[in-house]
Amino acid sequence: MGRTVKDPNRRQPKPVQKVQLSEKNVGRRIVLVVLFLAIGSGFLVYGFMNFLRGDSGWREISVKAGSELNCSEDFTLKYNVGAGGVSAGGEAKALSLIYTDAAVKGYRLFNIDESFDDVTNLYDINQHPNEVMTVDPVLYDALKKVSDANCREIYLGPLYASLENLCMSNDDAVAAQFDPEKDDDAAEEAAAVAAFAQNPDDISMEFPGENQVCLHVSDAYQAYAAEMGYTAYLDFFWMKNAFLIDYLADMIRGKGYQLGIISSKDGFVRCLDETGEKEYQYPLYHLSGNEIQSHGTMTYEGPKSIVFFHAYQAGSPDTYRYYQYQDGTMRTPYLSASDGKDHTAASELIVYSGEYGCADTLLAAFFDYQAESLSGESLKTLALQKIYSVWFENNEIQTTDEKFSVTAVNK
């Protein structure tokens, strides 16, 4: 078995990473804890409301108690129940049922670790290369979007497994064994997988018919994967929650519910509100040196999809996607199919749109974030597609949105 084989129990709760930080990083560690709390609560600030104790008003909607395994632990759904004049209790119950069903199905569709009787999912596709399989339209559309965007990073499944091993390491010496920047074997493996991922003749998605997919994998790649013990060619990895939040939002809106907002713990947001009557806020953070600084909050009206690219840990899902060495070096999940290594153009980039979902917004901006540095001109081109950006230069906020509004932080 290859040393990057994923632990079959890796999706279960894992022990907290115990990285020994040097004293010079203590300040940053404290700030990171504060940021974890901000994002862990939904990465949202509702500047226009107070949560009501009564029957009507804004509530957090949860999945049904005792429901099957689902993806809801990564998301927060809040909804203004009763605002349309209907029973708040009845509306909350109906929303919970819709949310539960969608969260269970989403968990199963994007699962790469096990199969389920009622769906054909990523695990099934990975286990049956070169076979035509009929999948749910949600998974079909996700795979088609990534393929159409030529985002070959979805084929880096083996390297994402190795990155998780790195990030779960309890000291730098162990982590370095999985780091292509520090270990020759890891570098050789990253280069080999990247070479396969770059080449459509070695691996590619084919779409032969309606809701039909076929993961083409060459004999050479299959032989290498067998030698290394790989279990997954395909993995949405850090991109997964962008597709899941779109699915959850579409299911809720599809049932006529629009006075809500969904956020993920790693910074994705789908605001469903089309009334234009409420003002929402999104906190702005910037990593300057070793300190994560608050730069106020961006105010906006719905509907809106927000994507947060970040080169540091910012929420609980990031625990298994990022690793910080004692010297401050950070490893991130933004691996490139060009070389199998992580690349980030800046400490953070926020992109948002009122026209597209999180997945489309992410795919439109991903290559900008993987460049050597952020290009204002390139981001202006995105603005022509109604995808707007916020970033920092010399600790100053930059934006391509003429209507951008920020509430300054109190100092």
Pin down the residues of each PLM region:
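Mature catalytic core of soluble alpha/beta enzymes
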Residues: 2-411
